[in-house]
Amino acid sequence: MGIARILSAVLFLSVLFVVTFPTLLSADHHDGRIDTCRLPSDRGRCKASFERWYFNGTTCTKFVYGGYGGNDNRFPTEKACMKRCAKA
């Protein structure tokens, strides 16, 4: 019975890998992670007012960040945003 469980686990993990592998190669991934430059701006959950920059698909735009939460499409300067997100 122990060998059957091991074989079942190996089969499950193999199927999981085959199903998820194409997603890892999709255009929304960059260096194995979701491309942060495609995420929408996200103010976060708090009420602070920090000036930050996000990439809107064309250029970097200023927005007010609340200080907590949000996503990774948030940069301290326009220059940092353009360096990470602008296509050459």
From Swiss-Prot:
**Which is an annotated GO molecular function term of this record?**
potassium channel regulator activity
Keywords tagged on the record: Disulfide bond, Protease inhibitor, Secreted, Serine protease inhibitor, Signal
Q: Which residues form the BPTI/Kunitz inhibitor domain?
A: 37-85
- Where, per UniProt, does this protein localize? Secreted
Task: Identify the propeptide residues.
Answer: 28-33
Q: Lineage from the top down?
A: Eukaryota, Metazoa, Ecdysozoa, Arthropoda, Chelicerata
Q: Which family does it belong to?
A: Belongs to the venom Kunitz-type family. 01 (intermediate) subfamily.
Q: Which SMART domains match?
A: KU
| InterPro entries in the cross-refs | Kunitz_BPTI (IPR002223), Kunitz_BPTI_sf (IPR036880)
Q: What does this protein do?
A: Serine protease inhibitor that inhibits trypsin at a molar ratio of 1:1.
Q: What is this protein called?
A: Kunitz-type kappaPI-theraphotoxin-Hs1d
Q: Which GO terms describe its biological process?
A: envenomation resulting in negative regulation of voltage-gated potassium channel activity in another organism
Q: Which residues form the signal peptide?
A: 1-27
Q: In which tissues has expression of this protein been reported? A: Expressed by the venom gland.
Tell me which GO cellular component terms the UniProt record holds.
extracellular region
Annotated positions for site Reactive bond for trypsin: 47-48
Got any disulfides in this one, which pairs? 37-85, 60-81
Provide the site residues for: May bind Kv1.x/KCNA: 39
Give one Pfam family: Kunitz_BPTI
